[in-house]
Structure formats: C-alpha cells, structure tokens
Design a protein with these regions (language model features):
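N-terminal pre-domain segments of enzymes
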Residues: 29-31
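Divalent metal-binding segments
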Residues: 10, 35-43, 48, 52-314, ...
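Structural alpha-helical segments in enzyme catalytic/regulatory domains
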Residues: 318-320
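Boundary at the C-terminal end of the N-terminal hydrophobic targeting segment
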Residues: 23-25
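N-terminal secretory signal peptides and thylakoid transit peptides that target proteins
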Residues: 1-15
Length: 353
C-alpha cells in the first residue's frame, strides 16, 4: 500500500547519489510479475538527483521505499501499473530530502502541541494577539509556552514584551516565554506555579531578577548558564502519553513540510533513556515515523557519566534498530564538563578574563 512514509522514505534516500545507479535500483524483471510495478511514479518534473552521471531526470519510480528507476518519463512510465499512484509534477522541481544533523525530535515532539510559535511573526502586536488567543483556549493547569524561535529584532517594535503586558493578557494562566538561551519571561501565574518567591535562591550560573522588595519579577537570566531556563520549563505539566504520541506526529509533519526527511537526534538534557523514548519507540514499532531518526544518548548526571553509559550499553547497542529508527551512539555531550555556556555574551565564571 502506498503511504506518506513510503514516499518520504524514498525522498530521504534521494540525498545519496549512489542510490541512482543501476546497481542500487530495484529491478522489476528480477522480482517477479507481482512486483513489477511501482507504488508511486512522479513524472513531468525537474528532478535534482545530485548524480553527475544522471543530472537531468524528469521522473522517479518508487517501490517499498526504494527507487526502481530515475530517468526520463519514457523510461519510468513503463513501471506504472494499474495500482500505481501517478503524480504529474507539471514541471515542478523535486529536491532531495534534507537531513538535519543536530536536532531534538524525541524531546521536542513530546511538547510540540503545547507550544505557541512566533517564528516569522512580523510585529510584537501580532505576537501578543496570538498569545491572547492561545491563553483563551488553554485549559488549566496547562501553560502557554513560546519556546524560542523568535527574537525582538524580527518585530517592527524591536523589543520584547514586558512582564506587565503579559500579565494583562494572562492574569491566571501561566505563560513561559524563552528568548534564545539568555532569558525567560514568566507572568505572575507562572511564578506561582513554579513556586518562586523572595526566599528562592539563585541557582549557580542563573539569576532570578527581583524588585526592590526582593520578590521575583518574572525575568530569569542565564548568567551564563541556561540551566535555570531549562529547569524552570521542565516544571510545567506534561501531556498524557497518547497526546505525546499525537504531538510527536505533528512535529514530524512540520519537519516534512520544511523538507526534512532525516535527522540525527542529539539527545539533550531532561531526556532519560528509556523512559523518555517510549513515545518515539511506539511510533517506530507501528511504522508511523515520517523522518529517518538516528538518536544519540545524552548523559544526564554530572560526574556520573560513566555509569549512565554502562546502563545504556546493557540495553541498547550502537546501530541497533532499522533504517527509520536506530541508535547512533553517545551525544550530544560525553561529559558535562565539555559543555560551554549558552549565553556567550557573559564571561565564564570558571575561566580567567
């Protein structure tokens, strides 16, 4: 049966030019009459092959996620049978699927449906209107979260919202805005939800800004360690498991929309194996992945890295998995001391000026 995954699987393979050689194409004459025809044929297009020996293809035939042929319409259309899905590209360009070699699909997918995106929003007024509308439909105890993807420089006003502006829109719904890796803005409801008070100490490398009376204002700063930002965000409610499955599917669909068909997942903080990989494993087991995903495992405990790695190697081996989901080794850090701090404008406290 032709599926979105079948097509995307072929598209991601397009990035490897040797797959276009005859030795790597499926031969319908060798696979029997029942397998002679393609699942999908794209024709009448402009195919970017990345193959110098075959740079001007106009059609592609795909079966079981593999190329049967890449060439001219005349050559490829003979592989179309009565059940083949035929797509007339009408002269449009087909590009190789993009492979992102550092992203966080496993972690990001769990929360994608909970996040409001300000990517590409041209004015702060529009962004705040989006925030207001999201607050109106967000049920308690969930937060409204804008987790990066924007900068004040994209807004016509050339500034970030103030805490007072956020409080006016959301007096009772927690709001968390992450700006790059240098700061987070929390409204009063979010401060109450996380329990930050005048008695809450600053964590190492982070600052809870305070008013004249010592009460938190809602501005958190990485100075220079962004741990305060991540740890605060992690205090928010999680989605139920089945909602996380749905959220991850939406995240992958967004990646597909942008042309991404393969990723190296870099692990990341607050991402423990195997508990936090249950959702992506379920999607893999059910053949629901629409990106090829090679995942790294990231140590979670400073000074206990060796034990983390020993625990993992007892349950998962390097390259264990399949073409769509496999273990890719350790990363993104091997030891915590290897990490630099994210706010590069701040001096490192452990290094001389």
């Amino acid at each position: 049966m032709t599926t979105r995954r079948t097509f995307l699987g072929a598209a991601s393979s397009l990035a490897f030019s040797n797959l276009f050689s005859p030795a790597n194409a499926a031969d319908p004459n060798k696979t029997g009459a029942a397998s002679m025809y393609a699942d999908i044929v794209l024709h009448n297009g402009l195919i970017t092959t990345l193959d110098r020996a075959n740079p001007n293809a106009t059609a592609i035939a795909v079966k079981d996620g593999l190329f049967m042929d890449v060439g001219t319409d005349r050559d490829v259309m003979v592989l179309a049978g009565p059940d083949t899905k035929i797509v007339d590209l009408k002269g449009k360009r087909v590009l190789p699927g993009l492979i992102d070699n550092h992203t966080h699909v496993v972690r990001g997918g769990l929360n994608f449906n909970m996040e409001l995106r300000w990517d590409g929003v041209r004015s702060l007024a529009d962004a705040m209107d989006m925030l207001k509308r999201q607050v109106a439909i967000t049920p308690a105890p969930q937060w409204v979260r804008v987790v990066g993807g924007f900068s004040e420089h994209q807004f016509a006003e050339k500034r970030l919202p103030t805490i007072d502006e956020i409080n006016a829109i959301a007096p009772d719904t927690p709001v968390f805005l992450l700006h790059l890796y240098d700061r987070a803005l929390l409204n009063g409801a979010a401060l109450r939800a996380v329990g930050y008070t005048k008695d809450t100490p600053n964590p190492p490398g982070g600052e809870i800004t305070r008013d004249a009376n010592g009460n938190p204002t809602g501005l958190l700063l990485a100075k220079p360690n962004a741990g305060i930002l991540y740890s605060t965000l992690s205090k928010g409610p999680k989605l139920p498991f089945e909602y996380q499955v749905n959220s991850t599917r939406h995240f992958m669909r967004e990646l597909n929309r942008l042309g991404i068909t393969g990723v190296i997942d870099a692990g990341g903080g607050f991402q423990n194996y195997p508990d936090d990989y249950a959702v992506i494993q379920k999607l893999s087991d059910e053949d629901q992945l629409t990106v090829r995903l090679a995942y790294n495992l990231f140590t979670q405990k400073p000074k206990e890295e060796k034990q983390d790695f020993l625990n993992w190697t007892q349950s998962v081996k390097y390259k264990q998995g399949n073409d769509y989901f496999r273990h890719n080794g350790a990363g993104e850090m091997l030891v915590f001391s290897a990490a630099d701090f994210e706010d590069f404008r701040q001096p490192r406290p452990d290094m001389p000026p």
